[in-house]
Amino acid sequence: LLTILLCSSLLCQAQKERIILGDEQTSEYFPILKGKRIAIFSNHTGMVGDKHLLDVLLENKFNVVAIFSPEHGFRGDADAGEHVSNSVDKKTGVPILSLYDGKDKKPSEASMRKFDILVIDIQDVGLRFYTYYITMCRLMDACAEYNRKVLLLDRPNPNGHYVDGPILDMKYKSGVGWLPIPIVHGMTLGELALMVNGERWLPASRVC
């Protein structure tokens, strides 16, 4: 089951709109997380104001049991393409689970059994060869397979609604191109996740 908290705008006193990110809407998603074993998919971009989402959840006594980190690692200090194995976040002590310890470049069943709900909070840039959306899709597939819920805290696409480039020919599907979308696709991760479900693009036509 996929739940998405979309971004919204707030008209401030200065008559300027400020984007309210999905992760700032704590009154909406804290009740969803209550009593759950939580895993997060995030990195150094997952900031709620001046604090990381992980710190916000732990400060509010939520049971965060695992972290899935994307390319470059949870703290953003790994090299491009570097394999990130199981480890522990030095700051919080929360285990970091490998995304690739199972078959088909997905988390293993043992990793998936550790949590009830996956929270996604990561900044994407709307490019087909950017790997974060590919990791999201693989996690959505694993969550669909093991009946785990997904909560996606959405963020704006910095390239707006700009769309450009050819759609990927799926015979060239790879680790830097996973969906039949343009090079610049013009969607947020939340919008893309909805499209993945709607078009049944996950393996075996699974729906998260």
Model-inferred region functions:
Residues 18-62:
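N-terminal phosphate-binding or glycine-rich loops at protein starts, especially the Walker A/P-loop
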